[in-house]
UniProtKB/Swiss-Prot annotation:
Signal sequence bounds: 1-19
Its EC number(s): 3.4.21.10
Protein name: Acrosin
CDD domains referenced in this protein's UniProt entry, alphabetically: Tryp_SPc
Top-level taxon of the source organism: Eukaryota
Keywords, ordered alphabetically: Disulfide bond, Glycoprotein, Hydrolase, Protease, Serine protease, Signal, Zymogen
Record's GO cellular component terms: acrosomal matrix; acrosomal vesicle; Golgi-associated vesicle; protein-containing complex
Occurrences of domain Peptidase S1 (ranges): 43-291
């Protein structure tokens, strides 16, 4: 027993050193410490996550000074011990740092809580709110923000940094199946956000399809990512704003935050998928705020060189996952035609958590933008029949004469539907599980 004592002491010291190093949040990013064993089985339905499954997930909570209560409003992603990534629209109405509290390492949250959090949760103040200089609250352009945290967050078993794309990765590859998480509402007009962190799988959707006339009719820009399902099924919702859209290469690779939950029309409606701010387009901006070294620490290894195989244009996950989730895309071959939009299938499904910051009203129809993934800026031309061109002209005139009006997600004058959740007096209605199909 005495002979084993030096070995035991050495192990204790080693564990102590590892734990100390881990508290700086400079370790590996995008790693799930505790995974739900069913996560690989259920492909379309949302489910409750396991504690510690998404250690970079942050709850942004509005703080009311008169009674010290906190109300979940948005989600965010921990980048390191000092910075959180989120959506700019979360601060349209609450721009002061003292209006906010940040909760890390949470699995369950209490809406309207006025007591200190319990371990392993950590509550922090916001030292600085950095909103993109060109953020447009009307068009939803540049919907990205950073929060400086004080005091620094301590990383551990339930708190860890998320990854951002590598500069050389390029835009997210389509098709690809990814994850969304949040404490958002489980359906439109739900009484309050979900008390438990939920997770769900969603498909990345081609921007041509997402911007077609029966979908978002050109509202989506080149710095957005669409994710969800054509028929609805599952989606983020109020209370999920600012939270991450995450993809990974394989079960052994880290998750990479490819999008920030921004806006959508309703929740889980057919042909109205969630719209996310693409993080890859803002890596330079993020580096200018948190520092290039800090950004490098949360970027995975440089991706493998792309294959010579032509990209597949599809809207359903392939039977075999691609070798990596990012790749440089070659120009679209002229013989490929973009897929036609699917027939309308009304469907109602729940949504994801986050206070409401609606900004999505189509006051004046905009021409659909060209496909926006990196090298896909030039769309090929196809010859249309006279009848087809006439039909397009009639549709365009109808849109100008009768612009589409969508119900707002926010109780203010703006018509866009943010995924931000406004807090209201607590309801006696029991909460329901989030994100089920």
């Amino acid at each position: 027993m005495v002979e084993m004592l030096p070995t035991v002491v050495a192990l204790v010291l080693a564990v102590s050193v590892v734990a100390k190093d881990n508290t700086t949040c400079d370790g590996p990013c995008g790693l799930r410490f505790r995974q739900n064993p069913q996560a690989g089985i259920r492909i379309v339905g949302g489910q409750t996550s396991s504690p510690g499954a998404w250690p970079w997930m942050v709850s942004l909570q509005i703080f009311t000074s008169h009674n010290s209560r906190r109300y979940h409003a948005c989600g965010g992603s921990l980048l390191n011990s000092h910075w959180v990534l989120t959506a700019a629209h979360c601060f349209d109405n609450k721009k002061k740092v003292y209006d906010w509290r940040l909760v890390f390492g949470a699995h369950e949250i209490e809406y309207g809580r006025n007591k200190p959090v319990k371990e392993p949760q950590q509550e922090r103040y916001v030292q600085k709110i950095v909103i993109h200089e060109k953020y447009n609250a009307v068009t939803e352009g540049n919907d990205i923000a950073l929060l400086k945290v004080t005091p620094p967050v301590t990383c551990g078993d339930f708190v860890g940094p998320g990854c951002l794309p590598h500069f050389k990765s390029g835009p997210p590859r389509i098709p690809h199946t990814c994850y969304v998480t949040g404490w958002g509402y489980i359906k439109d007009n739900a009484p309050r956000p979900s008390p438990v962190l939920m997770e769900a799988r969603v498909d990345l959707i081609d921007l041509d399809l997402c911007n077609s006339t029966q979908w978002y009719n050109g509202r989506v820009t080149s710095t957005n990512v669409c994710a969800g399902y054509p028929e609805g099924k599952i989606d983020t919702c109020q209370g999920d704003s600012g939270g991450p859209l995450m993809c990974r290469d394989s079960v052994d690779s880290p998750f990479v935050i490819v999008g920030i939950t921004s806006w959508g029309v309703g929740c889980a409606r057919a042909k109205r998928p969630g719209v996310y701010t693409a993080t890859w387009d803002y890596l330079d901006w993020i580096a200018s705020k948190i520092g290039p070294t800090a950004l490098h620490l949360i970027q995975p290894a440089t991706p493998h060189p792309p294959t010579t195989q032509q990209p597949v244009i599809s809207f359903h996950p392939p039977s075999i996952h691609p070798p990596w989730y990012f790749q440089h895309l070659s120009p679209r071959p002229p013989h490929l035609r973009p897929p036609r939009p699917l027939l309308h299938q009304p469907s109602s499904v729940h949504t994801s958590s986050a206070p409401v910051i609606p900004l999505l009203s189509l006051l004046t129809p905009v021409q659909p933008v060209s496909f926006t993934l990196a090298a896909y800026h030039t769309r090929h031309h196809t010859t249309l029949s006279f009848a087809r061109r006439l039909q397009h002209l009639i549709e365009a005139l109808k849109m100008r004469t009768y612009p589409i009006k969508y119900p707002s997600r926010y109780s203010g004058p703006v018509n866009y539907q943010h995924r931000f959740s406004t807090f209201e007096p607590l309801s006696n209605k029991p909460s329901e599980p989030l994100l089920h199909s």
